[in-house]
């Protein structure tokens, strides 16, 4: 997606941001249903924080169990993933949790490849995915360190 900016400078076009995160939110809901992270005939989701065209953090829940939400993350620079809602009080804490989780997942994958050389052709795919996890974790961690970007309101 081409980044659209207002004439005033670095502020992303609010309509473009809204279109971007709504499309991504639909994809997140489909993935959470497919993976079994949420279940039910009616699933709801609410975007909580976005870093435009890079990262979306949302709450996703079954309409029947609204108090049992999960934090979900998706975007250009990160994998689609989720954690239990109880693991973070807000989107920033969720981002920190995802960052740590992905570092640990990447380490575990690298260890698996070293311990099981018989994985053959899958080694390259595992290593590539591990690198993607680390890159996403590092990017997300850098974002959590920036005070300014956590105060923005989502475009309605």
Predicted regions and their residues:
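N-terminal "first-domain core" detector
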Residues: 1-51
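Acidic, proline/glycine-rich low-complexity IDRs
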Residues: 2-5, 107, 111-156
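Short, charged/polar micro-motifs that form catalytic or ligand-binding hotspots
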Residues: 11-18, 81-89
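Short aromatic-glycine-(Arg/Gly/Cys) micro-motifs in beta-strand/loop hairpins
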Residues: 50-83
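Compact, glycine/acidic-enriched structural inserts
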Residues: 88-109
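Hydrophobic, Leu/Ile/Phe/Ala-enriched alpha-helical segments that form helix-helix packing faces
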Residues: 24-36, 98, 102, 140, ...
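Low-complexity, intrinsically disordered regions in eukaryotic regulatory proteins
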Residues: 73-81, 104, 108-116
